[in-house]
Each structure stands twice: as structure tokens, then as C-alpha cells.
């Protein structure tokens, strides 16, 4: 019996981060955490592409642009922040963005991690950005690299 498992190493990996700018300081923390993790895990700066988009809704079309650009990425990390408000806008955006990211990952057979915070309030969002507890940008990059390594082995 063979068992396959990836390791979180950025050595020789080409990775992109697509990060939204809306909810700026929290989104910035996710992107910088993901980028720093890539470098700490042996990645080279010239093999990391960071693309900033206005909001989470723009992430899927930007992912598609990267996937069809002719550059071979081993993984992509999608970073953003959605905070629930008083209207249903949050629900529509969160549902559509998560569904499309998943579809693109399967369609292009490429690990695309969902490091998009969906939170009921700003305080909860900060908690998921590493202020108190886990850091979704860091864990998203680690998962992306682990999956990219696994895909190389399969």
C-alpha cells in the first residue's frame, strides 16, 4: 500500500497570492502573513506573485486570469475579508466567491486555498488574522504548499 502526503515547503515552488483590499488592515495582515510564510518555508521572492484586487468579489476573475496567463503556478492563495452587515450582500458575496474558487481549483487541477475570512464582526475577523489565535493567511499558504507538494507526488 502506498500513502502520499505533501510537506509545506516553498522550495522551487511558484505561488501567487490574490488578496482583496477591502477591510484594508485585516486584508493586509492576511496577505503579508501568507507572503512571509512562503519566504520562511524556503520560497524565493521572484517566484511569488502578489495581486491586490478591490474586493473579494474580484478574486475569482483574477484567479482565472492568472490560471490562463501561461505562467505555471503550483498553488494560489486567495485572501480576503468579508464582514457580515445588516443586508444580505455578505451572504451573496461569500457564497459566490467560495463556490467559484472551489470550481476553479477543480477545473484547473490546482490547489487554491480559501484564506478569506467570513466573520460576523470586525473583532472576529481580527482574531482570524493572527491577533488572537490562528492566522488564516499563514495557514492558507502552508496548506497551499502542502497540496502543491502532494500534487507533484501523485
From Swiss-Prot:
(2S)-2-hydroxy-3-oxobutyl phosphate binds at residues 86-87, 128. It comes from the Bacteria. Pfam families: DMRL_synthase (PF00885). Its EC number is 2.5.1.78. 5-amino-6-(D-ribitylamino)uracil binds at residues 22, 56-58, 81-83, 114. GO terms for cellular component: cytosol; riboflavin synthase complex. It is an enzyme of class 2 (transferase). One of its GO terms (molecular function) is 6,7-dimethyl-8-ribityllumazine synthase activity. GO terms for biological process: riboflavin biosynthetic process. The keyword Transport does not apply. The active site is at residue 89. It catalyses: (2S)-2-hydroxy-3-oxobutyl phosphate + 5-amino-6-(D-ribitylamino)uracil = 6,7-dimethyl-8-(1-D-ribityl)lumazine + phosphate + 2 H2O + H(+). Coiled coil: none annotated. Belongs to the DMRL synthase family. This is 6,7-dimethyl-8-ribityllumazine synthase. It comes from Chlamydia abortus (strain DSM 27085 / S26/3) (Chlamydophila abortus). The lineage of its organism: Bacteria, Pseudomonadati, Chlamydiota, Chlamydiia, Chlamydiales. The gene is ribH.
Amino acid at each position: 500500500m502506498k500513502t502520499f502526503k505533501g510537506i509545506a515547503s516553498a522550495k522551487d515552488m511558484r505561488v501567487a497570492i490574490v488578496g482583496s483590499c477591502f477591510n484594508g488592515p485585516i486584508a493586509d495582515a492576511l496577505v503579508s502573513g501568507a507572503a512571509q510564510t512562503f519566504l520562511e518555508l524556503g520560497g524565493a521572492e521572484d517566484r511569488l506573485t502578489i495581486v491586490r484586487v478591490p474586493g473579494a468579489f474580484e478574486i475569482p476573475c483574477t484567479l482565472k486570469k492568472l490560471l490562463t496567463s501561461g505562467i505555471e503556478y503550483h498553488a494560489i492563495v486567495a485572501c480576503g475579508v468579508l464582514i457580515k452587515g445588516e443586508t444580505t450582500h455578505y451572504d451573496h458575496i461569500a457564497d459566490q466567491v467560495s463556490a467559484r474558487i472551489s470550481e476553479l481549483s477543480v477545473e484547473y487541477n490546482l490547489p487554491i486555498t480559501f484564506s478569506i475570512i467570513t466573520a460576523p464582526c470586525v473583532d472576529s475577523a481580527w482574531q482570524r488574522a493572527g491577533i488572537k489565535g490562528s492566522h488564516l493567511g499563514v495557514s492558507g499558504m502552508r496548506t497551499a504548499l502542502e497540496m502543491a507538494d502532494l500534487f507533484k507526488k501523485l
